[in-house]
Every structure is written in C-alpha cells, then in structure tokens.
C-alpha cells in the first residue's frame, strides 16, 4: 500500500513540474471555411480613428476592433448596421492605449454620427482577440459605458496569472481586468445591456486563456455551463453554453490558430445575435 501511495505522489509531482505546451498553429480535422472578401455597397468615411461604413438604412452602429476592414463591413452590411472598423496592430495593450483618453470614444461616436447625418439609436462594441482590449478600456469610462447598449467579445477575454504563470492544476487569475466584464454581464442578465462572449480551447501559456476567464465569469455570476455538442457558425463545434437574461457565453472546440480565426469569420452570425 505504501509503494502505491508513493507512486501516486511521485506521479502527481511529475505532472506538476510539466507546464502545458502552447497551442499549435495548425489543425487539419475541421474544414475551417472562410468568408470571401468583398466590398459591399455603401458609403465610407475616414474618421479620426478607423473607417466608418454606412450601408443603406442603418440606425445602429457597431465599433469593431482587430478584424480588418472588409470582414466587419460584410457582417454589418448583411445585418443592416453601420460599422467603424479599427485595426491597430498586435496585443490587447495596443488597443487599450487607443482609449487612454477617456473622452475619445464619445468624440469618435459624435464624429461618426455627424458624418452619417443621423443619431444612432443603438451603439454596440465588438472585438476579436486583442481587439477586446479596446472594448474593455472604453467601458471603463462611465459616460461611455452608459452610451453602449451591447458588446461582443470573440475569443479575447484575457487577463494575467497572479503568479505570472499557470498553476499545476487550476490557475489563479487576476480578476482586475475582468471586473468590467462582470459588471456588464450582470447588467445583461438584468436586461439593461446585452453581452455575448465566445471562447475556444486555446492555451496561450503566458497569460490566462479565454476558457479560464470564462470559467471565472460563470462562477462569479452563479451560473452553470450546459454541455452541448452541435455545429456553430462557420463550421465551429460548440461544446458549452451559459445564458441568463441578455447574457450569453458560448464555448467552442479547438486549440489552434485556425480555430481562433474561425470565430472571427463567424462575425456575421454573432452580430445578428447581438442585435
């Protein structure tokens, strides 16, 4: 019996000393379909930050970060909303710095409304991957938070590890960067806002994964994930879901770069759900 106990302890120690490897860049099981690049009809205006696209009869506006230009325009055109597309480089900190001036977002919205010649009746924010850093920074300003009706976080809700690295079992993550998402989720559950969060199974290794942050959010909200197994938009495979009120969290299979990009190309459908 003693040798068995010693073996189990040794096995546990060995596993604790082996960090999980970062996620791969390739995946060959799923099809990973992609939207075809196109230029939908509509008016385009350069703004102080980003490009405004105005399809006909658009009364809602969507600010989207880190998705290029044509893809958000295609999604906006199909959903009949205006979109401001912003591409600013790599890393969530790069996008957060765009809104270090807490008044910048409302100025940008006012500029978009002036060029559109309309006061938008619905304001939505969205980001993919690093772009979620801009959304977080915007919402930290109470005046901007009050003006925003809905937000979409596509596989980009990250934070740091408390000790700077993942734990051997369940990691301890820094809740600081997640506080605004928790506030927004509670408002969505109460019906005051709408929030959609998606995540993959990607493990960055140097900061908390979107799976870990999603687990934290669900736990803090007192919700339970429901295990599902079904096809999602653009060939994604949905594994889990949690929802309450106007809050919705969806977990998708995949821990590779193509799986990450799949969710960006699902923007057309995700924006429809956000409306």
Predicted feature locations:
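A domain-start/cap signature at the N-terminus of enzymes
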Residues: 16-61, 235-237, 245, 275
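Glycine-rich nucleophile elbow surrounding the catalytic serine of serine-hydrolase chemistry
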Residues: 127-137
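Alpha/beta-hydrolase fold nucleophile elbow
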Residues: 117-129
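Sec-dependent signal peptide recognition
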Residues: 1-7
């Amino acid at each position: 019996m003693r040798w068995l106990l010693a073996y189990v302890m040794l096995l546990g120690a060995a596993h604790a000393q082996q960090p999980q490897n970062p996620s791969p860049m390739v995946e060959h099981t799923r099809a990973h379909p992609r939207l075809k690049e196109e230029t939908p009809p509509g008016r385009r205006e350069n703004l102080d930050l980003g490009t405004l696209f105005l399809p006909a009869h658009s009364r809602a506006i969507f600010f989207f970060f880190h998705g290029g230009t044509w893809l958000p325009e295609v999604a906006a055109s199909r959903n009949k909303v205006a979109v401001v597309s912003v591409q600013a480089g790599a890393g969530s900190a790069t996008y957060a710095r765009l809104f270090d001036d807490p008044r910048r977002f409302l100025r940008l919205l006012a500029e978009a409304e002036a060029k559109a010649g309309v006061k938008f009746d619905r304001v939505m924010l969205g980001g993919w991957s690093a772009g979620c850093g801009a959304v977080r920074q915007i919402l930290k300003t109470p005046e901007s938070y009050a003006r925003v009706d809905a937000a979409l976080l596509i596989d980009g809700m990250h934070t740091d590890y408390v000790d700077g690295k993942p734990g051997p079992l369940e990691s301890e993550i820094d809740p600081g960067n997640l506080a605004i998402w928790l506030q927004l989720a509670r408002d969505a559950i109460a019906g005051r806002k709408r929030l959609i969060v998606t995540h993959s199974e990607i493990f960055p290794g140097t900061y908390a994964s979107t799976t870990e942050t999603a687990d934290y959010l669900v736990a803090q909200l007192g919700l339970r994930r429901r295990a599902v197994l079904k096809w999602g938009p653009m060939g994604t495979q949905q594994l889990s879901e949690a929802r309450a009120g106007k809050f919705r969290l969806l977990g998708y299979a995949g821990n590779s770069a193509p799986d990450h990009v799949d969710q960006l190309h699902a923007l057309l459908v995700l924006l429809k759900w956000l409306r």
